[in-house]
Amino acid sequence: MASTVRRPVASLWIGERLHYLNQLCLLSHVKLGHPTTLYCTEKISNVPEGVTVRPATDIMSIDMEIVKQTSESFLSNVFRYKMIEKTNAVWIDCDAFCHRPFPDEMENIFAGHGFRGALNCGVVYIPQKGELIFQLLDYYQNLPDAPAWFNKQQRKRIEKQESHLPQAVRIYNAERTAFGPQAFTWFAQQTGDFEKALTSDYLYPVPFQLNDVFFDPYGRVEGHFTDNTLSVHLYTNGTKPWWRKNVPLSNSYAARMCAEMGVNPAEALEE
């Protein structure tokens, strides 16, 4: 393990067991000297050594009924900014591999991804007391009838939702990403922080649309990297079922990184 103690990072897990890709990504931050905390909604059986486990309620109360009606990602979208506000740690998704340490002096850590140019919030640090985090938290805590950026079609989808449903569920059912990249992009534009975004090669060097390359033994994943690259997003929400249920092929990026970090994929496959 690296002897240098770097800035803290943290994430959230909802469930009882990590997949090997999540173990790999968490451990990669530990190995590079980042104090790494995993906030959990329940006890997890296979957290890698070196990761600090804390209850998610250290950051906020958890309404699991809302999660059941939306998704785990909905909760994480609210949680990440509350976590930053409370702890000043860098938020990392559990499928973000640490390629190089996050510089201590970097005050804004976020970037666009894929081919659309919208900001992603899979790896995020923004100032604890800035206008951007204030507007994001205000949005989540005081949900509007419809997000300001919604078009007529999206607004109609909200109106079609049953009125007795929680507003978070109604918005989620109308647009699944309304609490994640859409919200982050919109509010960053309103506050002027959009211009502070890093280029995609820093945090999302491989576009989401090409995520199979991590499992291809002949894929040139590193060909996407630049000298700027700090994090490599593995996009497990888009990983094909075969790769989730089977060990990665020898010489693929996933297999090589597991060997480097000491992770045994066979012990943490999707069942």
Question: What do the PLM-derived regions correspond to, one by one?
Answer:
Residues M1-S76, C94-E271:
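Glycosyltransferase-associated regions of secretory-pathway enzymes
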